[in-house]
Amino acid sequence: MKVTLPDFRQAGVLVVGDVMLDRYWYGPTSRISPEAPVPVVKVDTIEERPGGAANVAMNIAALGAGSRLVGLTGVDDAARALNAKLGEVNVKCDFVSVPTHPTITKLRVLSRNQQLIRLDFEEGFEGIDPQPIIERIQQALPEIGALVLSDYAKGALAHVQTMIQTAKAAGVPVLIDPKGTDFSRYRGATLLTPNLSEFEAVAGRSKTEEELVERGMQLVADYELSALLITRSEQGMTLLQPGKAPLHLPTLAQEVYDVTGAGDTVIGVLAAALAAGNSLEEACFLANAAAGVVVGKLGTSTVTPIELENAIRGRADTGFGVMTEEQLKHAVELARQRGEKIVMTNGCFDILHAGHVSYLANARKLGDRLIVAVNSDASTKRLKGPTRPVNPLPQRMIVLGALEAVDWVVPFEEDTPQRLIASILPDILVKGGDYQPHEIAGSEEVWANGGEVKVLNFEDGCSTTNIINMIKASTSQS
């Protein structure tokens, strides 16, 4: 699936749900308390971050989309901290203050990146008059492209069915991060996003993929949903829609440090993408990529457009697309699982010029991903002569990796990339110049695998040799 990042600035999303403040106390631990067999933490750093529905709103704002937040808070320092923190990141807060209740707060104590204990300060908001929240939803509907209902079972969504019907009457899609086992509460929603445990608590454990799909489609029918997205941790995500084949998206996470708030990121990106005009399938692809980024961070976190762009282009932690052969094989495997077409080309690319850039842009247009295999310094010297390359391999790869058209850059030591091409087996092998397809290294292997081999023209008047000669001539004249 080929997906480009939308202009999130055109999107408006309202988040309604259980807001909370996440507090983090950090410090070293070097001894056990004499009072009890517990570690003593010397707190040296304190952080406060919006959590729950507030974290969903922050994820939406981090993308550059218009983000509004409605929820229930107390009249206390935690509520003031939430307002201040959210205002700093351009979330428009419209809280309903309840003087009789504290703002929900969760305190985590950490040492050496390990969470030692969590303390919750809360009192459920059940029984609170829902009308102020309903009125705020009605006021926002003309200006938003999606409504997110973030349910942590703290009472803000006690009248969730009224909220769903209010938004549906206005033609606004409703996305819900559910809680508990009573999914009938969410009847008629556009999309539910349970994680696997939440799904199995309602539908039962599935022994096979087919059984999971069958049980999921039954939930879609039973509760009149437009779609169901099951987030499955290391197994990625599965999107189920009536009348359509299941869409399985493998995880893109490289390393997992903390899953706190990952569900908030998923539904936030989903809503922003839908509000920006993406299809549901495209929005799920972007949300899956965002989840892979956020679980690599510690604590409740958000994802920026740059991080998301890097993730969907396979550049999350690869130094502008520069990869080893093994890393490339893994990236290509994931791309193929998403149905993407792989294009591959190669060259020395010693002094990058307009002809190179034009050629690579045209090569990228042939598929969804472009691999550029680059001759090592020793290989370039053997092919081009003792004075080449002008630019060493690391510099050549960094420049290539920074190009919009290029997804992945990989070096090779041989005179030709035939072995590397045979290992990767791209869908389309491309070479620039006056070659015949059968003369191109790796062509036989690509053809044998059912792929294509194409020759593209270079831009006239552009060559590295000409540039070097011009520089030499200019230097001699001076």
Curated annotation (Swiss-Prot):
- GO cellular component annotations of the record: cytosol
Which pathway does it take part in? Nucleotide-sugar biosynthesis; ADP-L-glycero-beta-D-manno-heptose biosynthesis; ADP-L-glycero-beta-D-manno-heptose from D-glycero-beta-D-manno-heptose 7-phosphate: step 1/4; Nucleotide-sugar biosynthesis; ADP-L-glycero-beta-D-manno-heptose biosynthesis; ADP-L-glycero-beta-D-manno-heptose from D-glycero-beta-D-manno-heptose 7-phosphate: step 3/4
Q: Region annotation Cytidylyltransferase: residue ranges?
A: 344-478
- Molecular function as annotated in GO: ATP binding; heptose 7-phosphate kinase activity; heptose-1-phosphate adenylyltransferase activity; phosphotransferase activity, alcohol group as acceptor
Which SUPFAM superfamilies does the entry mention? Nucleotidylyl transferase, Ribokinase-like
Q: Which positions bind ATP?
A: 195-198
Oligomeric state and partners?
Homodimer.
Q: Which PANTHER family does the UniProt record give?
A: BIFUNCTIONAL PROTEIN HLDE
Question: In its UniProt entry, what is this protein called?
Answer: Bifunctional protein HldE
Organism of origin is Pectobacterium atrosepticum (strain SCRI 1043 / ATCC BAA-672)
Taxonomically, what lineage is the organism?
Bacteria, Pseudomonadati, Pseudomonadota, Gammaproteobacteria, Enterobacterales
